[in-house]
Amino acid sequence: RQRFEHFHAGENAVAVEAVRAAAVDPAAPWVFVAGPVGSGRTHLLIAACQAAIDAGRTAQYLPLAGLRGSRAAAIRGMAGSDVLAIDDVDSIAGEADAEHALFDTFNRYRADGCSLLFASVAAPVSLEIALPDLRSRLGSLTQALLKPLADVERRQVLRDHAAGRGIELDDTVLDWLFAH
């Protein structure tokens, strides 16, 4: 399961804490998580939703890149939760309807005192968001920039996942995996 205790933070401990705080504390600043593919953005957003639920809040997760049909309608349909985690913000860049829907959702959640979390492959300043007000609002959030794990940490992640399934990975196997 994608929970905070299963996330190997490495150099990202401050970012993880910012996301956790935003999930469980309505007064905490909202967070925009940015990092390359495989850095754990999605894991953190799903973990945040689970932490919010564990804290007695309601939460929803919306992966924009995987949506078929109108992303604007999907964004507008996300309402009524204490925490909304929106993944793949970069995927709506240049989609006027989706950008406006996200802008409206941002304002609605702020007015309702709810929490929003966002994730993307790049920080808001680097996204090609056409709507200036949305770009500005996203840029005003706490920025959690994820760094990829070092190889030694990635090896430990693989060992831990395998151990959870009763498999022991030795260095020879890991050397082969990393080479291929």
For the regions a protein language model found, what residue spans apply to each?
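Walker A/P-loop nucleotide-binding motif
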Residues: 27-45
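Conserved nucleotide-sensing/catalytic segment adjacent to the nucleotide-binding pocket
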Residues: 74-119
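Short regulatory helix/loop adjacent to the ATP-binding pocket of P-loop NTPases
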Residues: 124-139
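Short conserved motifs of the RecA-like P-loop NTPase core
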Residues: 168-180
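Conserved AAA+ ATPase "SRH/arginine-finger" region at the nucleotide-binding site
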Residues: 141-153
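Conserved AAA+ ATPase "sensor/coupling" helix adjacent to the nucleotide-binding pocket
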Residues: 141, 155-168
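AAA+/P-loop NTPase substrate/partner-engagement loops
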Residues: 54-82
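Dynamic helix-loop-helix/coil hinge segments at AAA+ ATPase domain boundaries and subdomain interfaces
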Residues: 1-16
